Amino acid sequence: MNIFRLIGDILHLVSMYILIMKLKKSKNCIGISCRMQELYLIVFLCRYIDLFFVFVSFYNTVMKITFILTIAYTIYLIRLKLPISQTYNRKVDNFKSEKYLIPPCLVLSLLTCKTYNLYNILWSFSIWLESVAILPQLVLLEKQREVENITSHYVITMGLYRAFYILNWIYRYFFDDKPYINVVGWIGGLIQTLLYIDFFYYFALAKWYGKKLVLPFNGEV
């Protein structure tokens, strides 16, 4: 494991910690998309199905279990934990993932998986789904327009986690004994990173001018 992968994993954990602390301290989930969290739970469950039959390393196993449990706990806080759950607005967090994201990702997984077995299909599906899982969150923030400081830091940290994973892939391609090639993962990671760029742009402007982060609203989704 190289430094870029380690930093990426740390940033991913930090983003989860930021979100959970925001929920528990503020006692509300305004501006947080539970639909995005649910998509990530699907991503982790599909990708880490190998937990049941493959042991890579202690670190790998611990991280996989941590990601699954943490995202499940986050969903619990938003959906069920009072008083946080009382602030969840289902009418606003209404991106139709089951219509616009899951079916296309499933089709792509069938077209791009290496072999037609359950593990490879689920792994490919998880890559494509993660590449667009941020969309419900971005759409929700666009509707809300004014973004809380801690929420913006959560989204930025998520974007940085993915950016370091791309650096990890580049490093492995040039420095592994056998060049690391993962076309599906590369394309998925690139799509995911591109989706963050617009948010990064407005975040940088807000910081530069010392103003609150306010996103433009382009209509209903």
Swiss-Prot record:
UniProt KW keywords: Endoplasmic reticulum, ER-Golgi transport, Membrane, Protein transport, Receptor, Transmembrane, Transmembrane helix, Transport
Gene Ontology cellular component annotations, sorted alphabetically: cis-Golgi network; endoplasmic reticulum; endoplasmic reticulum membrane; Golgi apparatus
GO biological process: protein retention in ER lumen; protein transport; vesicle-mediated transport
Subcellular location(s) of the protein: Endoplasmic reticulum membrane
Membrane topology according to the record: Multi-pass membrane protein
Keyword Membrane: yes
Lumenal compartment spans: 1-2, 53-61, 114-120, 172-183
GO molecular function: ER retention sequence binding; KDEL sequence binding; signaling receptor activity
Stretches that traverse the bilayer: 3-21, 36-52, 62-80, 100-113, 121-140, 153-171, 184-203
Main localization category: endoplasmic reticulum
Signal peptide: none
Cytoplasmic topological intervals: 22-35, 81-99, 141-152, 204-221
Cited function: Required for the retention of luminal endoplasmic reticulum proteins. Determines the specificity of the luminal ER protein retention system. Also required for normal vesicular traffic through the Golgi.
Family: Belongs to the ERD2 family.
Protein name, per record: ER lumen protein-retaining receptor
